[in-house]
């Protein structure tokens, strides 16, 4: 997990959950833009992804492993005592929505980009 702080007066903190088989490095531009616009950013590589150590990339034993990571990042974000938002992309969006089904999160809002969802008619 990494933290990037804005050099401006902070408006809030954004916790980012990336897509499947991605890593933090792919979000350099997003992180830069958020910081430039007054937001701290907290993000890490999800278990089995990026620079995490797994024999088989993308493999986890339990989906709750993702929840534990996101909850820890949100806890750290809330230490700033300013509004916390979560941003989920693809798998990250699915993780956040699944987590919201199970528990109330201490956040001000969510942003979802192409969350992995199936909509039933």
Residue ranges and their predicted role:
Residues 1-5:
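A short loop-to-beta-strand scaffold at the N-terminal edge of the catalytic core in hydrolase folds
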Residues 11-19:
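Short beta-strand element of the alpha/beta-hydrolase
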Residues 13, 40, 83-85, 109:
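Structural signature of beta-strand start/N-cap positions in the alpha/beta core
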Residues 21-24, 50-80:
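Catalytic nucleophile-loop/oxyanion-hole region of alpha/beta-hydrolase
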Residues 26, 31-55:
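Conserved alpha/beta-hydrolase
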Residues 78-90:
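Alpha/beta-hydrolase fold nucleophile elbow
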Residues 89-121:
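Alpha/beta-hydrolase-fold enzymes
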């Amino acid at each position: 997990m990494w933290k990037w702080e804005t050099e401006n007066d902070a408006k809030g903190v954004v916790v980012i959950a990336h897509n499947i088989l991605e890593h933090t490095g792919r979000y350099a531009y997003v992180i830069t833009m958020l910081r430039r616009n007054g937001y701290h950013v907290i993000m890490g590589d999800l278990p089995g992804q990026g620079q995490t150590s797994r024999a088989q990339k993308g493999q986890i034993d339990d989906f709750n492993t993702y929840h534990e990571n996101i909850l820890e990042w949100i806890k750290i974000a809330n230490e700033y005592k300013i509004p916390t938002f979560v941003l989920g992309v693809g798998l990250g969006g699915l993780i956040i929505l699944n987590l919201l089904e199970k528990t109330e999160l201490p956040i001000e809002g969510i942003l979802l980009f192409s969350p992995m969802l199936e909509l039933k008619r």
